[in-house]
């Protein structure tokens, strides 16, 4: 009996020392922290004030709060000495003021022939960059297995979440993101060898985002085919591509979602397309 009791104790100790068990025991929702770092460049001061007035980081904090994470994740805006960039590193998602400056500068003043408004071209890429970097953070924090390039998986993570908004909002966000990719694709690459980059080429990301959107709702995005934005040959497999992402999100990410908080997030009206 004593030996059996000893075995039980050792087994319990072994179970609780298992890294996977320890990580799960620490998981909880509402682990998001935020930081607006005052810009060094005075040209970014209006953008800094606008982001604070609009409570942009507070909204992202609430939107991501259902994620059950093992430790805190910080979201922050800061100046990057002229570098237009965004990244996840050391438990923090950083988006540069320069990056948002480019988004505002590149957004069209008038509605485009494709129906993209200035607000679409600002809100879409703004949400996408945070959700893309959040994808990297989630993969790291939760040790999510990724088959293929992590950058592609982060794009899919972001696009999937954009498509969970109300249909009319989701359409505008996706078209705003596609506008940004298409604009980047039209410019000469500044990289020495863009084919060696960990990211897909802007043109590839453009078609991938449209394909996921069409696969999610063929009726809502039917005009992508009619107007020639998405080739019919690619469109034929888009429903399967989207379903594959849904299965991955359901199996790999959903177990780490606090459903009570997620319900509140889903019920909230998030977007106001009033950006100038």
Task: Give the positions of each predicted feature.
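An active-site-proximal "capping" alpha-helix that borders the catalytic cofactor pocket
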Residues: 147-166
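Acidic/histidine-rich, surface-exposed loop or edge segments in extracytoplasmic proteins
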Residues: 27-48, 138-140
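Pan-zinc metallopeptidase signature
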Residues: 24-34, 192-276
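Zn2+-dependent metallopeptidase catalytic core
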Residues: 48-72
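Catalytic zinc-binding patch centered on the HExxH motif and its immediate surroundings
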Residues: 77-94, 99-109
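Short alpha-helix carrying the canonical HExxH Zn2+-binding catalytic motif
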Residues: 119-138
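Bacterial N-terminal signal peptides
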Residues: 6-14
């Amino acid at each position: 009996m004593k030996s059996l009791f000893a075995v039980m104790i050792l087994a319990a100790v072994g179970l609780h020392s298992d890294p996977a068990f320890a990580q799960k025991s620490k998981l909880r929702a509402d682990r998001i922290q935020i930081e607006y770092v005052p810009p060094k460049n005075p040209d970014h001061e209006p953008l800094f004030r606008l982001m604070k007035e609009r409570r942009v980081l507070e909204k992202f904090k609430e939107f991501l709060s259902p994620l059950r994470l093992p430790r805190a994740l910080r979201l922050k805006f800061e100046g990057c000495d002229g570098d237009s960039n965004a990244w996840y590193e050391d438990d923090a998602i950083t988006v540069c003021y320069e990056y948002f400056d480019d988004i505002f500068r590149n957004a069209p003043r008038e509605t485009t022939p494709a129906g993209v408004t200035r607000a679409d071209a600002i809100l879409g890429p703004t949400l996408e960059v945070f959700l893309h970097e959040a994808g990297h953070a989630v993969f790291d924090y939760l040790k999510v297995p990724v088959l293929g390039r992590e950058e592609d998986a982060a794009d899919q993570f972001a696009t999937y979440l954009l498509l969970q908004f109300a249909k009319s909002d989701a359409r505008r966000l996706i078209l705003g993101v596609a506008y940004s990719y298409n604009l980047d694709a039209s410019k000469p690459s500044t990289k020495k060898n863009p084919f060696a980059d960990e990211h897909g080429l802007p043109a590839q990301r453009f078609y991938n985002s449209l394909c996921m959107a069409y696969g999610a709702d063929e009726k809502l995005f039917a005009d992508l085919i009619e107007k020639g934005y998405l080739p019919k040959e690619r469109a034929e497999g888009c429903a399967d591509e989207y379903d594959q992402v849904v299965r991955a999100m359901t199996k790999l990410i959903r177990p780490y979602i606090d459903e009570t908080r997620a319900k509140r997030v889903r019920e909230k009206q998030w977007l106001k397309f009033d950006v100038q």
